[in-house]
């Protein structure tokens, strides 16, 4: 009986959500304007304490309160401003509304940024 109680206690502890959970999400973009838009969308998500997007690696590094948000919610919010993530693609009409400089789906735009 004691062994069962110990297992239940350990299981509950393992599922405890963290207030300062570090996670990274891959987000498509090409420039500093993209960076600003992506970070703003992430930071406007309830429970996000820190967000920084790296132009070269396309990784959005986050510190989140898992009691208030999750990565899927953040991905939805980032896609809502026009940026694809690994899990969620931005709607075409939203993507088409971003600045021409930020059209990360266009190989010519991506190549032009690689030359910088």
Regions found by a protein language model. Name each.
Residues 1-19:
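Bacterial Sec-dependent N-terminal signal peptides
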Residues 21-50:
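N-terminal targeting signals for Sec/Tat export/insertion, comprising classic cleavable signal peptides
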Residues 37-41, 73-82:
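Short amphipathic alpha-helices in soluble, non-transmembrane regions
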Residues 50-58:
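RNA-recognition motif
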Residues 58-65:
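A generic structural motif
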Residues 65-71:
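Helix N-cap motif at beta-to-alpha junctions
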Residues 82-94:
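Conserved short beta-strand edge segments in small beta-sheet-based binding/regulatory domains
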Residues 95-116:
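Short, low-order "capping/linker" segments at domain edges
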């Amino acid at each position: 009986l004691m062994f069962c109680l110990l297992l239940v206690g350990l299981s509950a502890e393992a599922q405890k959500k963290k207030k300062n959970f570090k996670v990274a999400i891959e987000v498509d973009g090409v420039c500093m304007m993209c960076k600003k838009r992506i970070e703003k969308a992430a930071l406007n998500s309830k429970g996000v304490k820190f967000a920084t997007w790296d132009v070269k690696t396309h990784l959005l590094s986050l510190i989140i309160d898992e009691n208030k948000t999750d990565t899927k919610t953040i991905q939805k919010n980032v896609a809502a401003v026009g940026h694809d993530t690994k899990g969620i693609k931005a709607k075409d009409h939203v993507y088409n509304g971003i600045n021409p400089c930020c059209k990360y789906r266009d190989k010519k735009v991506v190549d032009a940024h690689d030359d910088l």
